[in-house]
Amino acid sequence: MRAAVAELGAVQIDAVNVLVRAHYLTLFSRLGPYPVRLLDELTGRRRQAFEYWGHAASILPMQFHPLLRWRMARAAEDKSWAGFRARVEGQRPGYLAAVEREVAERGPLAFTDLADPARRERPARYAASTMLWDRGSDGKTALEYLFDAGRLAADGRKGFQRRYDLVERVIPPEVLALPTPSPDDAQRALVLHAARALGVATANEIRYYFYLSAAVAKDRLRELVESGDLLPARVEGWDEPAYLHPGARRGQVSARALLSPFDSLLFERDRVERLFGFRHSFELYVKPAQRRYGYFVLPFLLGDSLVARVDLKADRATRTLLVLGAFGEPALPGSAPAELAAELRDLATWLELDSIEVADRGDLSPALRSAVDDRP
């Protein structure tokens, strides 16, 4: 588990739970069925990983903490937080310090645990929405600011609410004692890790892995090429120049995996299409009538090809894995339905679901249903 997180560098977290949370699913794709407590323990009592902003909210190897201190320092003074700081200190003098003090005395705390979460009345335009309810709290926003600025750290979650505690109670002392690299050095290390994780990639794909700006990525890539830590590369059929990590090796892939929409393999959709000829369609935030494939669609990797996609949902009330749609790619191999059925069985077992139900939607559904019913 620790090695898998270290190799990926960033395991994205997301609130969507129609099947299982994204970070658990990303590790299932690589490790197969595993006790989810192992990932929780990695960021919990074992203190071998931590949560911060990598590629969006992410689980990161603990050794990355020094590499992200520049991001924390910038967040502390970032203009995007200036309005909130000015308003809350104007309306509630000392509130930020009081929140930090309460966490020190009573942490770890979620925002709902605060003695005064300082809820705000929502603007009328959001009256019918539940999406922004939590942001109607100065307490929640204060905790998020202190987290972004590196003054608090995440200590697990309560439901899906982040719990906050003092940095020194979350990050091991030996990690806090590590020297803080310059922003340039830290960014070079992040770029190098992204390049190693991707194998061969364009500048945009590398920068997107840890959400670096285009200008920063351009400078760090140039420096790494000049030092010989990265190699410039040309890939047949690619319009843009690429970069290759010297340690990259051509490997033989014999994978069989369902991929979370938030998997690092799918971070950059143009890259997915260039590598696999597969247009990843991310439709979570598309209106239902406009969706082509479904709400929570997982590409299916077989060997070194993305050969199908399935729209999945875990019906926990009936303990059923619902395949709401199944769609094959043009070059679908004949073995794909049986291989996909086997992967769905592994997924259902891991999620403690008793049965699999395949709906009619999608060209692959009849063959997949037959394969699911034809248990070995």
Protein language model regions, located:
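Long, charged, low-complexity, helical-prone intrinsically disordered regions
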Residues: 1-376
